[in-house]
């Protein structure tokens, strides 16, 4: 049977009979560069994407620090203003659901969403600490499905690793290898194959297994095969 949603968490909620007419699935449309945080008095929400990419930023030492990429295989709890924000790296759309509703309907989805986000944050930290910036850039650009995307230098998903000069050198290395082309201040992917060879693989390997981490929705589905 064809899935209704690309995001496995939304599909799970839908499969459990929670159609959009039964509670306020708030539809979202966003464009690159927009940012949001939750007002202190607002109802906590989980955001699930159907397209686009967000980056989660947390506040450390009074500065916003990027800590995780959020795509269509993941959900994120919208942080309070005092904790950080989410920012759109690509145009997209999705749905916002009250946390309390998700918890009451399917606590497994809430648990798996939290666990997936922790894994994503751990991968981000490991990647930025252990891999060279050209590898990091290639991996994140590949994860974000960039075949027809043109980046500006200030929107590249480099995660604050190094300096702007280091980012320029990393882009030049990708260009010399034939992965990207720099023209008019924009960075265009010209070879996904070269980009894949240069990428460290941290985020792309995580994305391949993310959908499988969601637990079955009913006790019968969780029973081992006879």
Task: Pin down the residues of each PLM region.
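Short histidine-centered beta-strand/loop micro-motifs
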Residues: 35-41, 57-59, 78-79, 126-129, ...
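His/acidic/aromatic-lined binding-pocket segments of jelly-roll/cupin-type domains
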Residues: 27-28, 37-39, 44-50, 67-68, ...
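Cyclic nucleotide-binding regulatory module and flanking cytosolic helices
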Residues: 1-32, 73-75
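Polybasic "coupling" helices that flank or enter modular domains
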Residues: 107-164
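Phosphate-/nucleic-acid-contacting segments
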Residues: 142-226
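Glycine- and acidic-residue-biased ligand/ion/polar-headgroup-sensing regions
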Residues: 33, 43-61, 71-73
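Cyclic-nucleotide recognition modules
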Residues: 63-119, 123
